[in-house]
Amino acid sequence: MKNLTVLLKTIPLALLLFILLSLPTAAQADVTNKVNYTRDVIYQIVTDRFSDGDPSNNPTGAIYSQDCSDLHKYCGGDWQGIIDKINDGYLTDLGITAIWISQPVENVYALHPSGYTSYHGYWARDYKRTNPFYGDFSDFDRLMDTAHSNGIKVIMDFTPNHSSPALETDPSYAENGAVYNDGVLIGNYSNDPNNLFHHNGGTDFSSYEDSIYRNLYDLADYDLNNTVMDQYLKESIKLWLDKGIDGIRVDAVKHMSEGWQTSLMSDIYAHEPVFTFGEWFLGSGEVDPQNHHFANESGMSLLDFQFGQTIRDVLMDGSSNWYDFNEMIASTEEDYDEVIDQVTFIDNHDMSRFSFEQSSNRHTDIALAVLLTSRGVPTIYYGTEQYLTGGNDPENRKPMSDFDRTTNSYQIISTLASLRQNNPALGYGNTSERWINSDVYIYERSFGDSVVLTAVNSGDTSYTINNLNTSLPQGQYTDELQQLLDGNEITVNSNGAVDSFQLSANGVSVWQITEEHASPLIGHVGPMMGKHGNTVTITGEGFGDNEGSVLFDSDFSDVLSWSDTKIEVSVPDVTAGHYDISVVNAGDSQSPTYDKFEVLTGDQVSIRFAVNNATTSLGTNLYMVGNVNELGNWDPDQAIGPMFNQVMYQYPTWYYDISVPAEENLEYKFIKKDSSGNVVWESGNNHTYTTPATGTDTVLVDWQ
């Protein structure tokens, strides 16, 4: 159906009234699609700080601050408070279709020596029990039911990197990092005969390796190469998947091995596929190729710190401009295989609030408009719509100040969240810069024949916009924001040229057309990794109501369900590797391919491979390559590494934790690569190893 604003010029009044009364305000969010969030808007909630719906479960004593004057302590927010704000329409009217809640598991009860508490949910004690200050399992079930019945998905935070604060020399420090399995002590930090934890001191963040195998600050760091810990954490997340969660945000992914996390994702996707994204913090202007590699290879998306930091630099302090922002958009589309699955934001619990005291809220409004019309999965931090202020932790975690539905930002979010549900260009479309200078950025998102054109002026003077071209068809277009940010109408000519117009100072306009696509067009595939038999969901347009077929390259997959906009299939029994997916409708019309789905050899386990006496010259690194897809299929360009040699083992012994197929007879060798790409192979026979069905292992061999 064409954009209503284009039709207004020609429809008789009586017919127009009928259409307005019949038209839904937004497409209903599909809570059954747990792997595609590209058209959703996530609302991040620090559970303890949002709303106290049940005072009877509040803490007592030293860990509780009743008036929340001590932001390091519990303040009383709980799941009932979230339920209440769903039921009274605050979140649904805002257009929220997913909530990201604090880790729901039981956390430590002890007061940290510095006066801190576990209100934030990141100091886990027992992953198979709830945090009683948020609620019990029946409360959690009610939260899930309430959210789902209102078209809202639920994402949980998850911390498989560490338990809680601990000191090796002081068992009385907090709770000594103790971790429990449904009430039964597994172990603690200072008495660790089963080696559940790393005991390598704290990281100085000097290298990727150092940040993985040493403690993050004073947090007891799990040894994820320990089979007990590996199985406990994987069992625990399955418990919450069985409780109905729709997504997972994984904390501190930079501080765990990619190999173990890939095995975790394989486990999740085999059990209950849900959208999963991790936190890999990047500072302002920081670009990390390892970050891109992780997002492309681990099976997990990431919080898009490049997006978040750049938009803050443009609109908070002016240290960057729209040229820098556009460059970031272009480069990340190249660097991330699935850029539309990266989770975008303007602020969160680990950085200062976007709004700050004694400043205009206008740039917050502009930032929200850009966030909600850009590629990626947009996330709103609780209270941003109320212009909450605050510096770094804990000031950025103040209690929710108000639930006012009349703020400008609330209206902007509500309007654009609805547009995101209705127009697939915002979820699936590519980004094209159409007009730019330091103050002005006009960009277009398109998918099939659906188009959204957004114009932003962050400067203090208006601009005359000449020579703007667009993919919008001929017609007049009104501002979808309805002048919330001083937008205007535009006229598009038959050749795509837009008539000259004035773009207001600190103004934003959004123009759009929504067109159904007649032939099949894939917008999203999720997850993008899986073994034979796993379920994969394909969303897009023009698939038709009658069942067609889905191809992985030229191999047919079993169709589990089919509709015009969503298909579920089973990964076919094909050789492990990367495949391009296409949809063929019942009329034999075939879609363009959706590239690089990875078929795994089978279930995955994380194994530490190590090699002694591998001496190298400066600038040369060690890699591993072998006989399965997960080891590069003997292709040195796809070898795994570079390997490590500083913490768990020291040079000339090298090691790396790698996700490999379970119960598989592996053959492999180590190779040396210099900075020019020259390769030196090991001599002798291939190393051999049969992987276990579950758990972890370490394999140590000598260089040949």
From Swiss-Prot:
Any GO BP: carbohydrate metabolic process
Subcellular compartments: Secreted
Coiled coil regions, renumbered to chain: none
Catalytic activity: Cyclizes part of a (1->4)-alpha-D-glucan chain by formation of a (1->4)-alpha-D-glucosidic bond
Sequence positions that bind Ca(2+) 2: N161, I212, D221, H255
Residue span(s) of domain IPT/TIG: 520-598
Keyword Amino-acid biosynthesis found: no
Site description Transition state stabilizer, residues in chain: D350
Entry's EC annotation: 2.4.1.19
The protein, known as: Cyclomaltodextrin glucanotransferase
Biological source species: Bacillus ohbensis
